[in-house]
Amino acid sequence: MSAVAEITETTTTEMPTPIVFTDSAAAKVADLIAEEGNPDLKLRVFVQGGGCSGFQYGFTFDEITNDDDTTMTKNGVSLLIDAMSYQYLVGAEIDYKEDLQGAQFVIKNPNASTTCGCGSSFSV
């Protein structure tokens, strides 16, 4: 009797880290929504072509959630990301910083191979 062993090679891929929406960013968005006086507003983060590195980030308020949007909620604040933008933002951190240079939303994106000096555009 002979035994035949079958060896199968499996490749496992790690699930990408979801997008991190920091407490600081959620708190600032909550403040901005309160100023607008419209509790139905959500922060939409998107990626579009442009900037000196090829892609740039955008932020806007939106009342409508589209079918292809990914929705994240933090401390009662909703963040919307469309499907095309999501693929560029997987693993990113969306934060809000205040320092001597001013106050701004900041995206730390591990998918960006290069960024411009101002940090608002990137390439992959």
From Swiss-Prot:
Cofactor: record remark: Binds 1 iron-sulfur cluster per subunit.
Gene Ontology terms, MF aspect: 2 iron, 2 sulfur cluster binding; 4 iron, 4 sulfur cluster binding; iron ion binding
Domain of life: Bacteria
Keywords assigned: Iron, Iron-sulfur, Metal-binding
Alphabetical list of Gene3D superfamilies matching this protein: HesB-like domain (2.60.300.12)
Annotated GO biological process: iron-sulfur cluster assembly
Cofactor: iron-sulfur cluster
Entries under InterPro entries matching the protein: FeS_biogenesis (IPR000361), FeS_cluster_insertion (IPR016092), FeS_cluster_insertion_CS (IPR017870), FeS_cluster_insertion_RrpA (IPR023063), HesB-like_dom_sf (IPR035903)
Keyword Iron-sulfur: yes
Family annotation (PANTHER family): IRON-SULFUR CLUSTER ASSEMBLY 2 HOMOLOG, MITOCHONDRIAL
HAMAP family: Fe_S_insert_ErpA
Protein name stated in the entry: Putative iron-sulfur cluster insertion protein ErpA
